[in-house]
Amino acid sequence: METTPETQSKTHRLPAGREDWWSEDATATLIEAWGDRYVNLNRGNLRQNDWKEVADAVNSSHGNGRPKTDVQCKNRIDTLKKKYKTEKAKPLSNWCFFDRLDFLIGPVMKKSSGAVVKSALMNPNLNPTGSKSTGSSLDDDDDDDDDDEEDDDDAGDWGFVVRKHRKVEDVDSSEGSAFRELARSILKLGEAFERIEGKKQQMMIELEKQRMEVAKELELQRMNMLMEMQLELEKSKLGKRRAASGKKL
């Protein structure tokens, strides 16, 4: 009896001893589900509930085999990242997932490579090591269950050992330093404006005091002049009265 494709699909079994086996279709679904959340998080690390959503997306599209767990999905992504590093070092890659992963993690890899080279130039005592190879086959990887705590930063593309989480931390640190410098500059600018405004107010107060003193002085002078004029008028009237009295006598 001839076996139809439908019969083959129904009778398909996982490779012996490989409960974590991934097909290309399941891997493609995993990359899309993970990539959407990865980009939405500004290319940051996914949280546990994010990984559960990724696993649900994979299982809903490929539920024929054993359901994938969030840990298996994370380990698979770690393996894909290692494979991407290996393919990235080649002059030309024919790997079917290379373009998609290059779009997702390529920008982060470029920033990390620049940081690694700069660190190597500043620290010549770093021990050079070769990039870790993960083999040419993705479907037959044996490291999926051994990488629970392994991140994509265990080795740099330039052959120098890099601390875990270095890429994201370097980016976050540089952004944090830039924001701190900006905040300090704004604070200094505000303090300068405050000092200028304080001096301006002090000058206005001093000018108002001087204006009031001048006005007071002018008022006193006016009062004195009026009093002197009044006194002169009184003297003139008194002199006329005396003159008139002398004539009568």
Curated annotation (Swiss-Prot):
Residues 22-109 bind DNA. GO terms for cellular component: nucleoplasm; nucleus. SMART domains: MADF. GO terms for biological process: epigenetic regulation of gene expression; ethylene-activated signaling pathway; regulation of DNA-templated transcription; regulation of gene expression. Residues 122-137 have a biased composition (Polar residues). It is found in: Nucleus; Nucleus, Nucleoplasm. InterPro entries: ASIL1/2-like, Myb_DNA-bind_4. Pfam families: Myb_DNA-bind_4 (PF13837). Residues 193-224 form a coiled coil. Residues 121-157 are annotated as: Disordered. Residues 138-156 have a biased composition (Acidic residues). Disruption phenotype: Abnormal general transcriptome profiling. Reduced ethylene sensitivity. Gene3D superfamilies: Homeodomain-like. Keywords: Chromatin regulator, Coiled coil, DNA-binding, Ethylene signaling pathway, Nucleus, Transcription, Transcription regulation. GO terms for molecular function: chromatin binding; DNA binding; DNA-binding transcription factor activity; histone binding. Interacts with RBL. Interacts with the Agrobacterium tumefaciens virulence protein F (VirF) in the nucleus. Binds to EIN2 and EIN3 C-terminal regions in the presence of ethylene to facilitate their association with histone. Binds to histones in chromatin specific regions associated with ethylene regulated loci. Binds to the promoter region of genes influenced by ethylene. Interacts with SRT1 and SRT2; this interaction is enhanced in the presence of ethylene. Transcription regulator. Associates with chromatin regions that are associated with ethylene-responses in absence and in presence of ethylene. In the presence of ethylene, promotes histone acetylation in an EIN2- and EIN3-dependent manner, mainly on H3K14 and H3K23, thus regulating positively ethylene-responsive genes. This is Trihelix transcription factor ENAP1. It comes from Arabidopsis thaliana. The gene is ENAP1.
